[in-house]
Amino acid sequence: MRTYLLNVQEPYKTFILNWEKIFEWRLNKWKFAEMQVWDILEFENTKEKFEIISKNIFANFSKMMENLWFEKVIPDAESIDDAVNNVYYKFYSPEDEKKFWVVAIEIKKI
């Protein structure tokens, strides 16, 4: 079991702490590709810890949203299109999404 430091921006950090968001999503590269079920995520500034209870890889953000509880991935998005175009693509390009695919990490506070 490994521990990974994680930086999550607001409002998503608050959504996680309030249990409104149970999936953290990233491109499937670097440390996110290495993470495994039972590993620990630790918020960088607050030191709260979360256990990874599932990890799923999808071809793109839309497929991820179609297969997971939409409200538990991006609680403040109005639709899948809104989440993809106004949230995900602020962080990642469609080219990187296609190259690396997407990982959805289900977490539980410990």
What kind of region is each of these model predictions?
Residues N56-E71:
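Short, solvent-exposed secondary-structure boundary/capping segments
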